[in-house]
Amino acid sequence: MAETIKIKLVKSKIGTLPKQRQNLEALGLKKIGQVVEQKDNPQIRGMIDKVSHLVQVIE
């Protein structure tokens, strides 16, 4: 596995559940098209799984 992973927000968080919005905030994603770099670990992967319909993983 790589040390870091890039995550891009591709869909709006409007209409999502509060837990999903909290996951996006924890990942550091606020605006559509924003790309953040996070450590590649099981915790981050779990957050990505919860909002997989809103984000795109760039490896």
Swiss-Prot record:
A GO MF label: structural constituent of ribosome
Source organism, top-level taxon: Bacteria
An annotated GO cellular component: cytosolic large ribosomal subunit
Record keywords, A-Z: Ribonucleoprotein, Ribosomal protein
Organism: Alkaliphilus metalliredigens (strain QYMF)
Coiled-coil annotated residue ranges, if any: none
Protein name, UniProt field: Large ribosomal subunit protein uL30
HAMAP family: Ribosomal_uL30_B (MF_01371_B)
